[in-house]
């Protein structure tokens, strides 16, 4: 399978290059030159299959350039070996359902891709006898999932940037108490967008890239986005629901659903649910591309203003030249504040959107607990609020994280006497470095510790 950049379709890249680079050399994101298509008969034949078999079916066209079938099967089984016996589960909330994606090691949906990505790199690096330096920016869950998945793996050092004092305490401790010698935590005095911009600068810096082999652990990495399509496939095959409500910040999770749709799965509507940082909702509903400063909310993993994976979708609609111009201008806030009407119409054909305030989120946590005895984390609550505001029925709302990760918000709404059915202890001391939003300081820290 060949890959191209979202900003240049003239140069082909191999799966191995995509795995090594993370970000395309021109600053774009990697996408397949041609997305594999499955027939409806092939898809229907998956009904009754387990999660491992569905994963193998979806991943094999992308991984066979790197591994043989036996190794792919081993990677999948080892990746999910630390999950609960029930890898995914479903709960009813009246007219709609919850797809519970908190059965992994760090109790968030990021585990489903990150554990697989770690195994892909582990097997690949053994094969080629190479060392890699993984870089990631996180608003909370990506960092903890990456650290849990990659800690202790030979030939890998992992550096994670998070916005200082902008994650939940639980999220921060999941990142900072690993005790692993190959893990380096950076608390940046800035926003998630600042963290993400520094990561992208690292990939473009010629001097650092001559010294280190960088690759991305964020969803800018194609092999991070791809595995998330598996749980949408499992949900469709097991629940017969083809509409999904996805709490959205960086657009990676819902792009994975769109990818599955592009592969032939009969997905109907994809509903983008945002908090007050609602650029995705504004683009889809009103064609409004204005950028605003990040607002802190009670769903911090979605406190994002520039949604990186949106570039993958727009590359399909706009083509590489217009995509390159748009995102280069966005980085300088010099872009047009509206998309061409034909492009906006394509968005509207595939996506609905809505947004939720922090107050609405708190009310939803309270109402869902009182009516169904189900605890929602605030990000999941964003999705449920949006489904109700759109008056949607028979949709699958993604439950992105276990509520124990966001006890501050849950306890504010429901009090302290809540049974989370999870007993989590952080036994190691926290270890992280606080840095200013400065590229040179970050580069010096990496040189000192890598």
Predicted regions, residues:
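PLP-dependent amino-acid enzyme catalytic core
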Residues: 1-450
């Amino acid at each position: 399978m060949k890959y191209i950049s979202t900003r240049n379709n003239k140069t082909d890249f191999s799966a191995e290059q995509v795995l090594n680079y993370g970000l395309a050399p021109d600053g774009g994101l990697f996408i397949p030159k041609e997305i594999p298509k499955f027939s409806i008969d092939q898809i229907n034949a998956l009904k009754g299959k387990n999660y491992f078999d569905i994963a193998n079916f979806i991943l094999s066209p992308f991984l066979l350039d790197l591994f043989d079938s036996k190794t792919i099967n081993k990677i999948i089984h080892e990746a999910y070996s630390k999950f609960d016996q029930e890898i995914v589960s479903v709960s009813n909330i009246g007219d709609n359902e919850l797809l519970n994606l908190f059965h992994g090691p760090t109790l968030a949906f990021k585990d489903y891709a990150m554990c697989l990505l770690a195994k892909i790199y582990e097997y690949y690096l053994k094969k080629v006898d190479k060392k890699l330096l993984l870089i990631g920016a996180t608003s909370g869950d990506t960092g903890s999932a990456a650290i849990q998945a990659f800690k202790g793996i030979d030939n890998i050092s992992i550096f994670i940037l998070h916005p200082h004092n902008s994650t939940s305490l639980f999220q921060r401790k999941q990142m900072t108490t690993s005790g692993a010698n190959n893990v380096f935590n950076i608390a940046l005095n800035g926003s998630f967008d600042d963290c993400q911009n520094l990561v992208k600068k690292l990939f473009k810096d010629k001097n650092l890239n001559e010294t280190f082999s960088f690759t991305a652990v964020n969803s800018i990495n194609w092999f991070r986005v791809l595995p998330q399509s598996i749980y949408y496939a499992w949900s469709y095959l097991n629940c017969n629901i083809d509409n999904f409500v996805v709490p959205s910040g960086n657009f990676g999770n819902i792009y994975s659903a769109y990818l599955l749709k592009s592969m032939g799965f009969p997905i109907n509507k994809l509903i983008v649910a945002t908090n007050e940082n609602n650029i995705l909702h504004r683009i889809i509903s009103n064609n409004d591309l204005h950028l605003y400063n990040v607002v802190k909310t009670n769903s911090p993993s979605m406190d994002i203003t520039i949604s990186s994976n949106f570039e993958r979708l727009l590359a399909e609609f706009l083509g590489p030249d217009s995509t390159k111009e748009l995102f280069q201008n966005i980085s300088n806030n010099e872009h047009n504040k509206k998309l061409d009407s034909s492009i906006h119409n394509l968005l509207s054909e595939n996506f609905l959107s809505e947004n939720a305030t922090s107050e609405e989120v708190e009310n939803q946590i309270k109402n869902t607990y009182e009516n169904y005895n189900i605890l929602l984390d605030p990000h999941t609550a964003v999705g449920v609020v949006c489904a109700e505001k759109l008056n949607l029925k028979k949709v699958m709302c993604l439950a992105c994280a276990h509520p124990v990760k966001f006890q501050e918000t849950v306890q504010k709404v429901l009090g302290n006497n809540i049974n989370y059915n999870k007993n989590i202890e952080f036994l190691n001391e926290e270890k992280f470095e606080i840095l200013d939003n400065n590229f040179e300081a970050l580069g010096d820290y990496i040189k000192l510790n890598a």
